[in-house]
Design a protein with these regions (language model features):
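The feature captures the LRR N-terminal capping module
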Residues: 1-85, 94-150, 191, 195-200, ...
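Structured C-terminal portions of repeat-based eukaryotic scaffold domains
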Residues: 142-203
């Protein structure tokens, strides 16, 4: 196994120092570090890399997120396909915009309080014990309520997404290969997520429910793509007209029934 150290970065970086440049000056200059698929199992103190903005550490053996407190300029962090079981030590990354944590061992989405600039969170395909599902800490969801725009929670045995209603600026939700079952729950979610324009729920049990697609299109005016298929204006208008006609018939039937009851009541009185 390999530890990510300053020496390793200095040796392997694509950015080569000038002759007159000291190691310290060189490390301060680095903005991108890519050590994906290098058998990295731990992150050492990299605090000299003051200007680091993008860190690629996917496809490694990292079990704990450590020594990133210094990286206050970090905007993109790629940690997918490691051995991480807990989201921690990220509170100081105030500029972080994109966080990739798919393919780890994370059971609870937590520890993201204070990351008010986070726009994308990718936590798909966690390697959970059989029968367990990915959970969301309400404090983390509350912290991300205004910033998060893209969320990928695919393949995590999730059967309820109502907790996500708080994410008011979410515009893309990818939740394929889960256990979502109830159309009503999705209707409630879409009623809250007024900016959502793309939702992918392929290979969930709910997709097999009657009128599943029609009901979701009717409840959301912002949705443009559902399960990878574009929602055409003609399709939405047809469904709206159909619903209006159906509602009108219901009202008419109710009114006729009420009038009939009144008529029968008058007839009984006259008798």
């Amino acid at each position: 196994m390999v530890r990510l150290t300053l020496d390793l970065i200095a040796k392997k970086s694509n950015l080569k120092p000038r002759k007159e440049e000291t190691t310290l000056q060189y490390l301060k200059k680095i903005t991108h570090i890519n050590f994906s698929a290098k058998n990295i199992d731990a992150i050492e103190d990299l605090s000299l890399c003051k200007n680091l903005s993008v860190l690629y550490l996917y496809d490694n053996c990292i079990s704990q997120i450590t020594n990133l407190n210094y990286a206050t300029n970090l905007t993109h962090l790629y940690l997918q396909n490691n051995c991480i079981s807990c989201i921690e030590n990220l509170g100081s990354l105030k500029k972080l915009e994109k966080l990739y944590l798919g393919g780890n061992y994370i059971a609870v989405i937590e520890g993201l309080e204070g990351l008010e600039g986070l726009r994308e969170l990718h936590v798909e395909s966690q390697r959970l014990p059989l029968g367990e599902k990915l959970l969301f800490d309400p404090r983390t969801l509350h912290s991300l309520a205004k910033s998060l725009s893209i969320l990928n929670i695919s393949n995590n045995n999730i059967d309820d997404v109502r907790d996500l209603e708080i994410l008011e600026n979410l515009n893309q939700l990818i939740a394929v290969d889960n256990q979502l079952l109830h159309v009503k729950d999705l209707e409630c979610l879409l009623n809250k997520l007024m900016k959502l324009w793309k939702m992918d729920l392929n290979r969930n049990p709910v997709c097999l429910k009657p009128k599943y697609r029609d009901r979701l299109i009717l409840v959301s005016k912002s949705l443009e793509f559902l399960d990878g298929k574009e929602i055409k204006n003609m399709e939405r208008q047809f469904l709206m007209n159909w619903k209006a006609s159906k509602d009108a018939k219901k009202i008419s039937k109710k009114r006729n029934s009420k009038n009939e009851d009144i008529s029968n009541s008058h007839r009984r009185i006259s008798l």
